[in-house]
């Protein structure tokens, strides 16, 4: 704990601290072995099971599933993890406990930290009551119990009786699942019959709830002030003016407050840990203690596969949040669920901001305001969350569920009135209702199914001059970019062995079998790494676009780790266990995601050697203070040779702002050959880098001995029969599958099968968004190639997709994507008129049926649902001839497409050279099927 300060709120403390009545509450843990019975037919209450000694046994804390009780899975679920055993209904938990003699006359409280989700309690066969919360502890006042042995019976019912939405992450089968059990602390706590029920620490006062079980009014003193506590209890407001260090992300100072109650022979003391921080908004930014703050962080979807529920201990959350901080994050959004006390305690200590949400997602549930019983539960849940976790300085933002509908503004008003220590939002992904901040789908990069407003004329901006979220600047309050990312990548099947708990990765096993059946299982690691590295590039660009935006509230990444539900979304550079996949080190990630980041605005990534590279340097500074900077930059090739470099004028980067550093200019005429260059910008103790590609300005010439063809027709086949070398450009607009499925749900999908005349998938630079089960899209995951292959001698590349491939592989038609997503026709028509149709720059030809060890030169990584062998560039012998196939349009507008010209030149030189020596001869039937079309036969 940082800077502990104990503030003792009574003038007579020196006397009170030695009075036994004022000792901290006595606690007895009930963790351990409990008697148990399942009640699938709901007979227990009528059968008085609370008076029956239950026959089975389980260990608590835990769940039915952890203890092996429930219906064992017969068939694996396809679109998510599979619970080994599953149970929905009532389950009975029972144990004996002893009340010590020293507790005689005491009030005893039962705490069940987290139940899933309704609990009913009996003591010695007598009903105590019922509690119903997914977010806060269930607390039962047992009154005074006689010393000696007693029997406690708890019935937990996880039946879906309150329609909060089956997609809500507090219960959804796509994440933790609707488990039955009791986790966290399970304990008895003894107090005097007059006690401190709760203390809330506000900026200038304390709100103290006092309980009184004596049945009559009691005179008491709290903080030296007298009050009368009526039977039942009272809430009192007490003055509070601490003189202590404030809490923030850079200096998370925590303090302890002792509140002491004296009521005659009764008394109590409650110790509260708190942090002093003032959260607000100004100029469309969040402020913490008056300083602008940018929220940067992932979404926690409650994916904890070993237990099926979130960790309840502080050490586990220290690990999770320390990992997040190592990647430069300072914020976490809990998607339609609330974390436990241990998470807040860890965040307080580490200086981390939480966005908590009520358990609501109305996708398949009534809108708020349409279901009175459910609405009462949600209102009560809001109150419970604010009381249980309100003192935590990490608890900064509160949203009313995820992407829900209804009169949610009522909840915002209620939250503001009850607890102004945090900021409130109606729900996520919407800007139409009342809120202290907005969330919107504005993105750094436009993908095939992301937001509608981020598209530029080119389809995306890769480190571009657009800030990436500029459309949010009209909002009157801070705006958070909602669920940025969701770029799919290929799974690494070695992770399957890590699923040893209540949830198993049978979905991954199915994908692995499919890949093996296609003869490509040996490529699993390559697919995972190439698609993963590509995804990291996209995350970098999105994050930087958000950081360039000013003023702005921040961004939430969906997700830093994989989400093995909702159709199976492999989207993280971490796996579902928060373990690194080895795609990027935290130190490298922090170069573009941290409080202070060097940034660059540049109009494009591909240049010719007769151009001058120009860019605008900036720095985003949300550090603790203004930062003197002396910017320096270098432009170097892959060998480290400096092409150009220089310094920019020294300046001071104000905290809470994006500051311009100056313009960078570098003539590229000294770059004689095709090259990838790296621009590195250093400023204020930080550095960041970006790749650009520089190509010769000349048009490629066709070398002798190579025939260029555009159809696999009789002329082409005759040339091959004569032993000629042919570079065939297959029309990327022909032979395509029709992508026409609609959303069927995470456990249903209509996959594409080979049909006559449909032998390729539409090419796209961007990878799949989330997954194919939920969104209509081509679904491919980037490319895989061998950079050392001689076909790339004149076209430098990595093994994975990078920005120089963007123009070659093609981009989704914005208008068509919008139509598929259900956007208004007028909106789509306008976008189509403005931008035109930029699809069909390439296609991915289906090469199923080729030998297992046959590999295309440019292999398109297919979605793990389909696992087709796909190629955009491949080669084969055809009798005595040699055929090189390129399914990319490298000719259209070639004068303005340097990458297209350069790739064509590289392929021509390869086809003319000695190293063009295809090792396979693909069947003529296959070539005719994938390379000929009805109008060419």
Give a label for each model feature.
Residues 735, 770-898, 916-937:
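Catalytic beta-strand/loop cores that center a nucleophilic Ser/Cys/Thr
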Residues 704-769, 880, 886, 907-910:
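Short alpha-beta junction capping motif
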Residues 418, 558-622:
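Aromatic-rich peripheral "rim/lid" segments of glycoside hydrolase catalytic domains that contact
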Residues 67-99, 103-123, 129-130, 193-200, ...:
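Active-site-adjacent substrate/metal-binding segments within catalytic domains
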Residues 37-40, 83, 88-195, 213, ...:
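Accessory beta-strand-rich segments of carbohydrate-active enzymes
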Residues 123, 205-230, 236, 612-651, ...:
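Beta-strand-rich binding/interaction modules
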């Amino acid at each position: 704990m940082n800077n502990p300060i104990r503030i003792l709120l009574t003038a007579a403390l020196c006397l009170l601290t030695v009075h036994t009545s004022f000792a901290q509450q006595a606690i007895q843990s009930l963790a351990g072995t409990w008697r148990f019975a399942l009640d699938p037919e709901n007979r227990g209450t009528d059968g008085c099971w609370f008076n029956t000694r239950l026959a089975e046994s389980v260990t608590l804390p835990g769940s039915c599933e952890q203890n092996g009780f429930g219906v064992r899975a017969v068939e694996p679920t396809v679109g998510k993890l599979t619970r080994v055993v599953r149970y929905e209904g009532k389950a009975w938990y029972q144990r004996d406990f002893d009340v010590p003699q020293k507790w005689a006359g005491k009030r005893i409280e039962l705490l069940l930290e987290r139940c899933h989700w309704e609990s009913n309690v009996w003591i010695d066969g007598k009903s105590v009551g019922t509690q119903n919360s997914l977010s806060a502890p269930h607390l039962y006042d047992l009154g005074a119990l006689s010393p000696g042995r007693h029997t406690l019976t708890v019935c937990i019912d996880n039946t879906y009786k309150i329609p909060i939405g089956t997609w809500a992450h507090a219960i959804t089968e796509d994440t933790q699942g609707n488990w039955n059990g009791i986790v966290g602390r399970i304990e008895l706590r003894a107090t005097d019959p007059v006690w401190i029920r709760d203390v809330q620490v506000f900026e200038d006062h304390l709100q103290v709830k006092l309980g009184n079980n004596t049945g009559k009014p009691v005179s008491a003193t709290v903080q030296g002030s007298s009050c009368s506590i009526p039977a039942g209890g009272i809430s009192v407001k007490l003055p509070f003016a601490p003189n202590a260090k404030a809490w923030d992300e850079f200096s998370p100072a925590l303090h302890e407050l002792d509140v002491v109650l004296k009521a005659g022979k009764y008394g109590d003391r409650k110790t509260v840990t708190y942090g002093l921080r003032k959260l607000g908004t100004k100029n469309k930014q969040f402020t913490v203690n008056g300083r602008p703050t940018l929220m940067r962080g992932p979404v926690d979807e409650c994916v904890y596969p070993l237990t099926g529920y979130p960790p309840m201990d502080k050490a586990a959350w220290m690990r999770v949040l320390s990992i997040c901080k190592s990647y430069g994050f300072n914020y976490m959004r809990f998607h339609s669920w609330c974390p436990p006390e241990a998470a807040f305690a860890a965040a307080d200590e580490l200086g981390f901001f939480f966005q908590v949400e009520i358990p609501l997602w109305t996708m398949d549930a009534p809108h708020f305001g349409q279901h009175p019983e459910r609405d009462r539960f949600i209102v009560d849940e809001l109150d419970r969350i604010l009381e249980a976790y309100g003192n935590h300085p990490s608890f900064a933002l509160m949203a009313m569920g995820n992407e829900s509908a209804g009169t949610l503004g009522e909840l915002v008003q209620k939250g503001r009135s009850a607890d102004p220590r945090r900021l409130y939002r109606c729900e996520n992904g919407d800007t139409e209702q009342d809120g202290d901040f907005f969330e919107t789908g504005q993105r750094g990069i436009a993908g095939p199914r992301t937001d509608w407003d981020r598209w530029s004329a080119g389809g995306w901006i890769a480190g571009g001059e657009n800030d990436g979220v500029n459309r949010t600047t009209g909002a009157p309050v801070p705006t958070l970019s909602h669920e940025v990312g969701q770029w799919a990548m290929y799974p690494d099947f070695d992770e399957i062995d890590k699923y040893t708990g209540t949830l198993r990765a049978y979905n991954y096993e199915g994908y692995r079998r499919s890949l093996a059946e296609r003869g490509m299982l040996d490529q699993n690691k390559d697919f995972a790494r190439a698609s993963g590295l590509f995804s990291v590039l996209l995350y970098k660009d999105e994050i930087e676009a958000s950081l360039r935006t000013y003023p702005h509230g921040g961004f939430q990444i969906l997700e830093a780790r994989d989400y093995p539900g909702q159709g199976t979304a492999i989207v993280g550079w971490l796996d579902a266990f928060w373990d690194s996949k080895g795609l990027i080190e935290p130190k490298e990630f922090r170069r573009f995601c941290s409080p202070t980041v060097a940034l660059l605005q540049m109009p494009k990534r591909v240049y010719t050697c007769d151009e001058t590279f120009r860019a605008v340097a900036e720095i985003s500074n949300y550090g603790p203070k203004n930062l003197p900077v002396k910017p320096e930059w270098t432009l170097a090739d892959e060998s480290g040779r400096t092409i150009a470099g220089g310094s920019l004028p020294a300046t001071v980067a104000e905290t809470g702002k994006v500051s311009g550093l100056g313009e960078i200019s570098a003539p590229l005429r000294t770059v004689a050959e095709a090259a990838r260059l790296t621009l590195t910008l250093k400023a204020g103790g930080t550095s960041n880098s970006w790749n650009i590609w520089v190509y010769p300005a000349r048009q490629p010439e066709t070398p002798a001995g190579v025939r260029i063809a555009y159809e696999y027709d009789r002329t082409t086949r005759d040339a091959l029969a004569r032993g000629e070398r042919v570079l065939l450009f297959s029309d990327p607009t022909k032979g395509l599958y029709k992508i026409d499925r609609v959303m069927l749900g995470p456990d249903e999908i209509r996959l594409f099968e080979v049909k006559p005349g449909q032998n390729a998938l539409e090419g796209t630079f961007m990878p799949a968004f989330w997954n194919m089960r939920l969104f209509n899209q081509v679904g491919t995951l980037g490319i895989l190639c061998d950079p050392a292959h001689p076909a790339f001698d004149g076209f430098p590349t990595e093994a994975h997709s990078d920005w120089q491939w963007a123009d070659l592989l093609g981009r989704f038609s914005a208008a068509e994507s919008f139509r598929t997503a259900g956007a208004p026709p007028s909106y789509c028509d306008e976008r189509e008129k403005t931008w035109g149709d930029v699809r069909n720059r390439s296609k991915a030809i289906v090469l199923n049926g080729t030998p297992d060890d046959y590999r295309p030169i440019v292999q398109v990584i297919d979605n793990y649902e389909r696992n087709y062998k796909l190629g955009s560039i491949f080669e084969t012998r055809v009798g005595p001839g040699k055929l090189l196939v390129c399914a990319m349009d490298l000719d259209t507008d070639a004068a303005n497409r340097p990458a297209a010209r350069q790739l064509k030149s590289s392929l021509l030189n390869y086809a003319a050279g000695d190293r063009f020596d295809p090792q396979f001869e693909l069947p003529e039937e296959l070539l005719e099927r994938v390379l000929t079309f009805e109008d060419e036969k």
